[in-house]
């Protein structure tokens, strides 16, 4: 068979692409030639090691009254250049913003002006100049001297078109940060959010700790792990899927309030809410229960939101969300009754629950015959209730089958003292009254091993050392985990988790 004939539009698009590539290559060649010329003149910009700048762009603007008429030195990336004839304007950008530059032949001389004109957008320069305001009131530096610090050998995307392709933005985040100020703002806010979380917990006398990322057992969550091999020990090891079991060991050891902010790794799919490598916080408090964890969650999130946004209210994808405490509390049984129309208080057996699953045509994670009443309760909530929870809501009292590390509900042996927090129909946190009975914990792990044998590769592994720690004795404890990336999505109105992770996981290009 012959090759498929291209349409006129496809031919035109290919020609345009070829033209753009040729233009790009010509610009790269031109910049390489400029670098060679500089090197021949003994002005290699890559031989510059350090710059003594006196001010940032923002400091010049903030202190204009005292700096007017004085000389300062700034440094940054050249973002625009409008120099024609004997004078002109430019802009450079540093971490804090942009500042305008004005150059004139009378101040720098003909040779220096000629050199300045050879600079390209994207080059790094240092500028020494006098601070003044233009007739339009813009704070500007009147250039007296300059130095090329680094040569940009590839042109930046066009100013007005910018870097729009999301895939390319994620792969080349360094270019994305240069071209899109709002992206830089998102990541500045990310840093502020994590700082505020630490501040909140430190003020409550929590101790920040670090636990292993490599472990012989993947525990603390229902997830598929990444596996690696330790050559010296000749054993397979796992990248952690959660920090839970190590942090609880520290509660056993006498650290009564601990937290860890760090990376977890789960060998699962990638979508707008999931990245295989993600940041989470887990915290544990001795002598506390899941009610205390609700109080910490709602107050911490409200504190962080107000700290970085000035209010507990945010707009997320056009919906106003208010994180002000107290958040709504509803049991999973009541949520299923409200949103699925099924009263699980009346469901007595697994078989009755399976009949309900059939009638609702539920999608289940395992075969119907292997599903328990608790499995079906959770599936009904996920199918009918989860996406309805737009405002911050704690869904409480999960079935024990789905919560192997959790204490049973006081007064109900079928349920556990566990909650998950939901916002905009999405889970952002998970918390328990932690199970501290080593005998029951071992039984729960054994049940999870049976689940693994049935094909559930996300079921928990047996952790004998953790059982040993519980046998030494762990006090009643409340525990909480929050997905920091998802929280940041809400506080920055970001629709994809990739928009709040600097370098998200991407499929390699060929």
Swiss-Prot record:
Segments forming a coiled coil: none
* Magnesium as UniProt keyword: yes
GO CC term (a single one): cytosol
Q: Does the keyword Ion transport apply?
A: no
Per UniProt, the keywords (alphabetical) are: Aminoacyl-tRNA synthetase, ATP-binding, Cytoplasm, Ligase, Magnesium, Metal-binding, Nucleotide-binding, Protein biosynthesis
> Cellular location of this protein?
Cytoplasm
Which residues hold Mg(2+) 1?
420, 427
The note on the cofactor says:
Binds 3 Mg(2+) ions per subunit.
Looking up InterPro entries in the UniProt record yields: Aa-tRNA-synt_II (IPR004364), aa-tRNA-synth_II (IPR006195), aa-tRNA-synth_II/BPL/LPL (IPR045864), Lys-tRNA-ligase_II (IPR002313), Lys-tRNA-ligase_II_bac/euk (IPR034762), Lys-tRNA-ligase_II_N (IPR044136), Lys-tRNA-synth_II_C (IPR018149), NA-bd_OB-fold (IPR012340)
Tell me its family.
Belongs to the class-II aminoacyl-tRNA synthetase family.
Q: Give the protein's recorded name.
A: Lysine--tRNA ligase
- State the species of origin: Clostridium novyi (strain NT)
């Amino acid at each position: 068979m012959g090759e498929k004939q291209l349409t006129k539009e496809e031919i035109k698009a290919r020609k345009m692409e070829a033209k753009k590539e040729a233009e790009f290559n010509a610009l790269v060649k031109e910049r390489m030639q400029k670098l060679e010329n500089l090197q021949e003149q003994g002005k290699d910009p890559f031989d510059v090691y350090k710059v003594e700048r006196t001010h940032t762009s923002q400091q010049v603007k903030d202190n204009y009254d005292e700096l007017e008429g004085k000389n300062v030195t700034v440094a940054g990336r050249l973002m625009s250049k409008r120099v024609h004839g004997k004078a002109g304007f430019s802009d450079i950008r540093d971490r804090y913003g942009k500042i305008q530059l004005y150059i004139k032949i009378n101040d720098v001389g003909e040779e220096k002006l000629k050199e300045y004109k050879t600079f390209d957008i994207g080059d790094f320069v240092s500028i020494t100049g006098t601070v003044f305001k233009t007739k339009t009131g813009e704070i500007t530096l009147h250039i007296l001297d300059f130095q090329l610090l680094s040569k940009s050998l590839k042109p930046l995307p066009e100013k007005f078109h910018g870097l729009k392709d999301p895939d390319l933005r994620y792969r080349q985040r360094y270019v994305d940060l240069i071209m899109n100020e709002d992206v830089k703002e998102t990541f500045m806010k990310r840093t502020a959010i994590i700082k505020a979380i630490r501040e909140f917990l430190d003020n409550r006398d929590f101790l920040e700790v670090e636990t292993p990322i490599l472990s012989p057992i993947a525990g603390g969550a229902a997830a598929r792990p990444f596996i690696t091999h330790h050559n010296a020990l000749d054993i397979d090891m796992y990248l952690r899927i959660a920090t839970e079991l190590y942090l609880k060991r520290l509660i056993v050891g006498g650290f009564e309030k601990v937290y860890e902010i760090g990376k977890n790794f789960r060998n699962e799919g990638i979508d707008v809410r999931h990245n295989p490598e993600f940041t989470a916080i887990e915290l544990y408090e001795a002598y506390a229960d899941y009610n205390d964890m609700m109080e910490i969650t709602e107050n911490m999130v409200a504190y962080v939101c107000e700290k970085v946004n000035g209010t507990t209210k945010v707009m997320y994808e056009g919906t106003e969300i208010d994180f002000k405490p107290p958040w709504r509390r509803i049991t999973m049984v009541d949520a299923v009754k409200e949103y699925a129309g099924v009263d699980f208080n009346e469901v007595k057996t697994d078989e009755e629950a399976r009949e309900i699953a059939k009638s609702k045509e539920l999608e289940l994670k395992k075969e119907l015959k292997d599903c328990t009443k608790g499995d079906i309760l959770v599936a009904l909530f996920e199918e009918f209730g989860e996406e309805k929870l737009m405002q911050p809501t704690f869904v409480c009292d999960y079935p024990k089958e789905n919560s192997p590390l959790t204490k049973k509900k006081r007064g109900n042996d079928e349920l556990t003292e566990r909650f998950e927090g939901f916002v905009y129909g999405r889970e952002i946190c998970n918390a328990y009254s932690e199970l501290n009975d080593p005998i029951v914990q071992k039984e729960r792990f054994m049940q999870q091993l049976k689940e693994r044998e049935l094909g559930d590769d996300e079921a928990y592994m047996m952790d004998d050392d953790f059982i040993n720690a519980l046998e030494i004795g762990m006090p009643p404890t409340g525990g909480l985990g929050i997905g920091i990336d998802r929280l940041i999505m809400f506080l920055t109105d970001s629709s994809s988790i990739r928009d709040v992770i600097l370098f998200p996981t991407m499929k390699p290009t060929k």
